[in-house]
């Protein structure tokens, strides 16, 4: 039988107040507080590297970070985020190498049932977010549950990304749409 954690990361309905999940969330709150209070960026990145599911060696995240668990976040090499990054990781959030994230960006994997009786039962579920390499998100970008983005995607400030897109595109708007294709230079 699956644990509530196993159900959660698989995107199946789960009980968020399960004791294992509450303990994981409490640990995340403690690490989040330690990170957000740390003034030495080197020590701050050591907290992240020991906490998140996986990271590249080179990363920088400004403070005022908010997560659900942290352990379901996987960041590639050369990851940068400005202030106020929110990553609600009830399902895995995976971002490839060379990502630049503007201020006030949100990566949201949780979902709730549309039916009010189901929603009021307390069950929740989620969908993972997967983003390829060379992602650039302007300020205030929101990436919603279940989104997959290819390589070399640029999301303009304030974009709300509600569906998946392939490689080499510029996205903007609410909901986000392709406003430009990015020419690919030879390797």
Language model regions located:
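Terminal amphipathic alpha-helical/low-complexity segments used for targeting or macromolecular assembly
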Residues: 1-58, 176-187
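Short secondary-structure boundary/capping segments
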Residues: 5-6, 51, 121, 128, ...
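Arg/Lys-rich RNA-binding interfaces used to dock onto structured RNA substrates
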Residues: 49, 63-66
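Acidic, glycine-centered active-site loop in nucleotide-sugar glycosyltransferases
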Residues: 165-167, 172-175
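C-terminal/domain-terminus segments
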Residues: 152-164
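Short-chain dehydrogenase/reductase
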Residues: 11, 60, 136, 154, ...
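Flexible, glycine/small-residue-enriched loop-and-beta-strand segment within the central core
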Residues: 65-75, 80-149, 174-187
């Amino acid at each position: 039988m699956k644990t509530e954690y196993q159900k959660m990361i698989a995107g199946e309905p789960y009980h968020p107040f399960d004791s294992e999940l509450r303990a994981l969330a409490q640990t995340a709150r403690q690490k989040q507080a330690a990170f957000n209070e740390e003034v030495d960026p080197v020590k701050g990145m050591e907290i992240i590297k020991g906490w998140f599911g996986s990271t590249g060696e080179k990363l920088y995240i400004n403070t005022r970070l908010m997560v659900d668990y942290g352990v379901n976040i996987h960041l590639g090499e050369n990851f940068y985020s400005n202030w106020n990054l929110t990553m609600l990781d009830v399902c895995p959030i995976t971002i490839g190498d060379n990502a630049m994230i503007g201020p006030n960006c949100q990566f949201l994997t949780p979902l709730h049932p549309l039916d009010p009786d189901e929603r009021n039962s307390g069950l929740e579920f989620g969908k993972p977010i997967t983003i390829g390499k060379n992602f650039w998100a302007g300020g205030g970008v929101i990436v919603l549950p279940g989104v997959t983005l290819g390589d070399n995607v640029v999301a303009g400030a304030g974009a709300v990304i509600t569906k998946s897109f392939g490689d080499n595109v510029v996205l903007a708007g609410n909901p986000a749409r392709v406003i430009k294709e990015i020419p690919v230079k030879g390797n």
